[in-house]
Structure formats: structure tokens, C-alpha cells
A protein has these predicted regions:
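Early exported N-terminus immediately downstream of N-terminal targeting peptides
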Residues: 25-106
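Sec/Tat signal peptide C-region and signal peptidase I cleavage site
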Residues: 19-24
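Surface-exposed, polar/charged faces of alpha-helical domains
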Residues: 45-48, 52, 88-89, 115, ...
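Bacterial N-terminal signal peptides that target proteins for export
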Residues: 1-8
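Bacterial N-terminal signal peptides
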Residues: 8-18
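Low-complexity, intrinsically disordered terminal/linker segments enriched in charged
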Residues: 163-219
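Short beta-strand edge/turn micro-motifs at domain boundaries
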Residues: 147-173
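Surface-exposed, charged secondary-structure patches
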Residues: 104-146, 198-219
């Protein structure tokens, strides 16, 4: 894992939290504010469970993070031009693999990430149509603040995260560079085949709702 990637994961483990959206009756900023507090409350409420069973953090991650990220779009963006060079089944397994990569990393760092002071700046539209940038300043006592941006866009279920930008550096661009190097070294098909999730025996795909399922337990 690159140092840039590690920085993103440490800074954003909690902040890439759930976006409990009531359709689009809430603004993007209101959604981030409410859901961030919900995660803080959940970690406090479940402190005993987390201390006795650290793996319980994966339950929280699955419940509060996964449903509110557009992993299909993120996977497409992070692979870039290679996305259209792999077939649909490979696209599906890559989505699972990329999602699970993030889930595992979040679970690793969640337990020790607390005592944050979170402030918000005015939300701005992004260059891409329909995308809104939610801005946070995150400070821990005695440390310099970090500036974090959440590019989010609406779908039928509310606002969905499509990237994370910390101090001006995009998470997707960081992973894109890492994956590009691996593809250059071993080739696209070998890179895809190296992903555990791409060894599934059966993959089912509902293109209408982006419901992705396999016979394997990926977590």
C-alpha cells in the first residue's frame, strides 16, 4: 500500500461514513453532518462489543458505509480506459474486489480513530454536472487540521460518494496510479485474475438496480 493511500485510509476511516438519506429532502451537507454524527454515536454505543470483538467493526462498516457509496462508478473511474477492455463478469468482480479492499482497510483503522473536531465549509458544485463537493475540516487536539472534500452526487436513493479528496489529493487518482503500475507490470488480465473476488464460480448481476451478488462470501 502506498503512503498516500495509507494517509487517505487513516484520515477517512470514520469520515467515509453512512449517508442516511431521506430521498433528496436533505442537502448534501446536511446528509454528511447527520450521518457523521450517527457513526460517532454508534462507535460510542458499541464500544464494549468492539473491545471484546474487534472484528465487529466490519459489521458497522457493512451497515453504515457500503450502502452509501457508488462503488460501480468508483470502480469505473479507478480503472479508467481499462474498464471497457474487460467483460461484464470481470467488471462485476472488480467492483466487489475494490469495495472489499476499502472495507477491510476501514475496519483496520476504525477502532482507534476518535476525538475529532469536525467543521464544515460552504458546499460547492463540481465541474462534473450533478456532483456536489461537501467540505470538512477535521482536527484532533494538538494537531493541524486536515481539509477533506467529498464529491457526492444524487441517485434515486439519495447522495452517494464517488471519491474522497484530502489536501487536494484524490483517493481514486491515487489508486488509479497504483493499479496502472500493476497492470503495466503484469498485464490487464493477470491483474484482474489476481483479485480474489474474480475467482468466483458464479456471478449474478441486476443491471437495473446495480445489485451485485456471488456465491462466495467476500468479506
Amino acid at each position: 500500500m502506498t503512503s498516500i493511500t495509507r494517509l487517505f485510509l487513516i484520515l477517512s476511516g470514520l469520515l467515509l461514513s453512512t449517508f442516511q438519506v431521506n430521498a433528496l429532502t436533505m442537502t448534501a451537507e446536511e446528509t454528511v453532518r447527520e450521518s457523521t454524527q450517527e457513526v460517532l454515536d454508534r462507535l460510542h454505543t458499541d464500544q464494549d462489543k468492539l473491545e471484546s470483538n474487534p472484528k465487529y467493526i466490519q459489521v458497522i462498516v457493512e451497515e453504515l458505509i457500503v450502502p452509501h457509496f457508488d462503488f460501480a462508478t468508483m470502480s469505473h473511474l479507478v480503472l479508467g480506459k481499462y474498464w471497457h477492455e474487460i467483460n461484464e463478469s470481470r467488471q462485476i468482480c472488480f467492483i466487489h474486489g475494490f469495495k472489499n479492499l476499502l472495507v477491510r482497510r476501514y475496519a483496520d483503522i476504525f477502532l482507534g480513530y476518535d476525538d475529532k473536531i469536525i467543521a464544515y465549509q460552504p458546499t460547492e458544485p463540481a465541474e462534473d454536472e450533478g456532483v456536489v463537493i461537501v467540505k470538512q475540516t477535521v482536527t484532533r487536539p494538538g494537531e493541524e487540521p486536515f481539509f477533506i472534500e467529498y464529491p457526492v452526487r444524487p441517485d434515486d436513493n439519495g447522495w452517494k460518494v464517488i471519491d474522497l479528496v484530502v489536501e487536494g489529493i484524490s483517493l481514486l487518482k491515487s489508486y488509479h496510479g497504483t493499479f496502472q503500475s500493476e497492470i503495466n507490470e503484469q498485464g490487464l488480465q493477470a491483474f484482474i485474475q489476481s483479485i480474489k473476488e474474480c475467482n468466483a464460480q458464479e456471478i449474478k448481476y441486476d443491471s437495473q438496480s446495480m445489485v451485485i451478488d456471488t456465491v462466495l462470501d467476500f468479506l
